[in-house]
Design a protein with these regions (language model features):
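C-terminal and inter-domain tail/linker signature
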Residues: 1-127
């Protein structure tokens, strides 16, 4: 029995569709490689490391975000594919729960696909 791997554009389109529906955790569970590496633009913090290694660590990072932010709206644009990579733009209007501060943030994410799964993601945003 053989399995068919998703192409980069299929992975990209599925990720964007799921994120637009607010199903980010499902996207991670379905599309990310077991050994995914996720890199944030910032230096990290005591609560959240700059790097996450493995799907469980990426899911935990997403849970930390959800636990600490109320998302009022989100927009996802793209994908813009190139070979085994694609870029997606994410824009959020959120309130940081601990401080009560509301802000908008925009980030570009570069995803690399290997063997039909997202193997690496890197986020770019101003600090």
């Amino acid at each position: 029995m053989s399995t068919t791997q998703l192409s980069t554009i299929e992975v990209a389109n599925t990720l964007v569709d799921l994120c637009r529906q607010g199903r980010n955790h499902e996207a991670i569970a379905q599309l990310y490689a077991d050994d995914i590496v996720s890199i944030e633009a910032g230096a990290g913090s005591p609560e959240m490391s700059r790097e996450a290694h493995g799907r469980d660590a990426v899911l935990a990072k997403g849970q930390w975000w959800a636990d600490n932010h109320d998302v009022h709206s989100s927009q996802v644009t793209g994908p813009w594919p190139h070979d085994d990579q694609f870029i997606v733009n994410h824009k959020y209007d959120v309130t940081h729960k601990p401080s009560g501060k509301r802000f908008t943030m925009e980030e570009a994410a570069l995803y690399t696909v290997k063997d039909g799964k997202i193997a690496h993601e890197a986020f770019f945003y101003s600090m």
